[in-house]
Amino acid sequence: MRVLLTGGAGFIGRHVLRELFARGHEVRVLDSLRPDVHATGSGSTVGGAELVIADVRDAKAVDRALEGVEGVLHLAAKVGLGVDVGDLPDYASSNDAGTAVLLAAMARAGVKRLTLASSMVVYGEGLGRCEEHGAVRPPPRSAAAMAAGSFEPPCPVCGRPLAPELVDETTPFDPRNAYAISKVAQEFYANTWAQVTGGSVAALRYHNVYGPGMPRDTPYAGVAAIFTSALRRGEAPQVFEDGRQRRDFVHVRDVAAATVLACERHVSGVRAFNVGSGTPRTVGEMAHALARVLHGPKPVVTGHYRLGDVRHITADSSRLRRELNWLPQVDFDQGMAELAGL
């Protein structure tokens, strides 16, 4: 299949590109190579794919990039936490308007298969379980509570501590920052496009992705990259809150495999898929694991916090396994050891 891969010069995009080539697809990459995401010179080659250097908001460039294409994998986006109000226009323009421009161009070109990179952030705090009230949606955490060292979100009914729950794709949207809002908007735009054109959408809600090629020294570096960079400088990783916040860390090669499978196998309707390892870990666990494999200093739990961060978000990825026959291949210990060898 001939496909267009937006954001194909980025961290996840490069791995998706390799997976597409490995499975025999012909790929055209569209990427703006924006300097706040790409290190100098990175992305100037994309492994033999045709590269269109352009912004996804450039309708004429997107029209040209879609010529002869059968499907689109849309990964181009501004990422990060998105808690600075000054960043709101960039998130809305890069992610929301960019997706709208792409979808309009796909409608003009008659391209009806979309694989969309969404994110676990659409769920906000996800779900928690109260001993008395069962599964509930945790409220936003207050600055006052976190400043006092109280990091667990309370039950919105009785105020008791909540146990974290796995979230599946039926969990309601609850975006807590600009990036999350933009990802929800992308999914809604894609759903509307599919209804009007009869196209298909596979929205892949990536959980915490790590692995080779992670951005290390940009504003968008994930926690694994931040910890690794600190350890390579001989510094102790700085762990926010109490280190017990839970995440589903999933290797980028597994994410790439899921993305390409969705492109190949989901051919009708609109469907969301969580992409996670299925094994929740705490942020503190990751920091200690990286410190061990890199023979670095022990992590320091700082108690610092960021408004807009969620406490726990862990995936139920059974739909992806069941419907697309996907299984993660890289376990946590193997992934940590691989990071140490980079």
Q: Over which residues does each language-model region extend?
A:
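N-terminal Rossmann-like NAD(P)+-binding domain of SDR-like oxidoreductases, especially those catalyzing
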Residues: 1-203
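Residue-level signal for the nucleotide or nucleotide-sugar donor/cofactor binding architecture
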Residues: 57, 86, 94-97, 170, ...
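CheY-like receiver
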Residues: 64-68, 105, 230, 258, ...
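Short-chain dehydrogenase/reductase
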Residues: 84, 207, 272-275
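Structural element of the ATP-grasp superfamily
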Residues: 102, 190, 227, 320-321
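NAD(P)-dependent short-chain dehydrogenase/reductase
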Residues: 127-147, 153-163, 178, 188-247, ...
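C-terminal substrate-binding subdomain of Rossmann-fold SDR/epimerase-dehydratase oxidoreductases
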Residues: 231-342
